[in-house]
């Protein structure tokens, strides 16, 4: 059985409180590949209990978890030493790096090298969501010090796997890729079966509830608040690790719920009002496959996850969102038809399609 090594900044179970769209996608990818390959994971932060199966093993430390400069520097040193030691003792068939670990890439150490790009950490020209002044300074310093190195990595790896056509185009432009055919779009796997009935808002006897996940300025929380003010007879429920205390009677804190089925059962329509270009839109696909209509920003990879009628192009304009919500309330037949079309779109994100795409890459 061939061996694959993943060099990851973190390896989390989807139910871990620290999990994100990227860590969930990595977890599901590794779970699928472990049915065909031996998997080694080198990561300083592992929160998976139990380890998925006997084909997966981890090299970890868990000593340097935290955001302090000391921990970050120690983590970099740990990466460097651990990757060097790993290659001294092992000869994997495939090495997989990510945005965070690609600085340690050495094409001579493995016959096939793959780079996973699910986010913007290497895009030093792009301001990150929620970036503060210190983070902005660090990004600009990285741009000065690391741009040449990162461009070299992107052009030397054998394959780049990314999570949307939007990201593919951004990678080609940002890193001046000379062989764009090596960039493979593998949509993140969504392991929610479409067995949930459509939630028709015209049949709801109680007050309709519109939901949002992780509101923040980058996620467009001002849209959420503006809609709550415009529709006082509609409940607005948000889910996050922290209670934001919005001080509006019809805005309800739903807590943090890792189980998506339980979360989506509490709302009738989801908005994804991101004001920055999301690489993909996992939550919108999960909601569609859970029977919910979803309205999304025309931003980044979000537009690839739903039918075009669910997309708002002028996504920074509150009036556009108000009009779309009113459209949803007044055109329930069209709303359901648009949801059905979005459900068809979501079929390209199912676990089986993801596995097929992965095997085409890793078997070649």
Regions found by a protein language model. Give the residues of each.
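N-terminal subdomain of nucleotide-sugar transferases
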Residues: 1-47, 90
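Donor nucleotide-sugar binding/catalytic pocket of nucleotide-sugar-dependent glycosyltransferases
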Residues: 155-196
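Short hydrophobic beta-strand element within catalytic cores of glycosyltransferases
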Residues: 293-296
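Conserved acidic donor-binding segment of nucleotide-sugar-dependent glycosyltransferases
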Residues: 215, 309-319, 327-332
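A charged, aromatic-enriched C-terminal amphipathic alpha-helix characteristic of glycosyltransferases
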Residues: 74, 316, 333-363
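Conserved catalytic-core segment of nucleotide-activated headgroup transferases in glycan assembly
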Residues: 192-194, 199-249, 253
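Active-site proximal beta-strand in glycosyltransferases
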Residues: 5, 94, 107-140, 161
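Membrane-proximal helix-turn-helix segments that form the acceptor-binding/catalytic region
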Residues: 28, 84-85, 136-160
């Amino acid at each position: 059985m061939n061996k694959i090594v993943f060099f990851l900044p973190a390896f989390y179970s989807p139910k871990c409180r620290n999990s994100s769209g990227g860590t969930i996608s990595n977890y599901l990818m590794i779970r699928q590949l472990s049915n065909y390959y031996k998997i080694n994971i080198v990561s300083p932060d592992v929160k998976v209990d139990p380890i998925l199966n006997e084909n997966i093993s981890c090299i970890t430390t868990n000593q340097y978890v935290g955001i302090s400069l000391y921990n970050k520097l120690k983590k970099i040193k740990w990466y460097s030493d651990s990757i060097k030691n790993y290659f001294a003792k092992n000869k994997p068939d495939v090495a997989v790096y990510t945005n965070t670990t690609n600085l340690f890439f050495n094409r001579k150490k493995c016959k096939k090298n793959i780079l996973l790009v699910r986010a913007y950490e290497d895009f030093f020209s792009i301001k990150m969501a929620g970036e503060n002044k210190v983070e902005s300074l660090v990004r600009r310093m990285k741009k000065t010090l690391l741009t040449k190195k990162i461009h070299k990595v992107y052009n030397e790896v054998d394959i780049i796997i990314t999570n949307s056509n939007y990201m593919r185009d951004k990678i080609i432009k940002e890193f001046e890729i000379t062989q764009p055919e090596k960039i493979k779009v593998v949509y993140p796997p969504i392991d929610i079966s479409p067995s949930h009935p459509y939630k028709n808002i015209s049949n709801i006897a109680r007050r309709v509830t519109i939901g949002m996940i992780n509101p923040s300025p980058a996620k467009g929380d001002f849209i959420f608040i503006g809609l709550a003010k415009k529709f006082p007879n509609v409940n607005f429920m948000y889910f996050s690790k922290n209670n934001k205390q919005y001080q509006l009677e019809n805005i309800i804190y739903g807590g943090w719920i890792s189980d998506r089925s339980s979360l989506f059962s509490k709302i009738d329509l989801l908005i994804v009002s991101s004001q920055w270009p999301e690489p993909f839109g996992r939550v919108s696909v999960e909601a569609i496959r859970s029977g919910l209509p979803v309205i999304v920003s025309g931003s980044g990879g979000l537009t690839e996850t739903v039918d075009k009628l669910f997309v708002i192009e002028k996504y920074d304009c509150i009036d556009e969102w108000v009009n779309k919500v009113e459209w949803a309330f007044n055109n329930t037949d069209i709303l359901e038809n648009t949801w059905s079309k979005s459900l068809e779109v979501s079929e390209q994100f199912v676990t089986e399609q993801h596995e097929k795409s992965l095997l085409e890459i890793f078997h070649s």
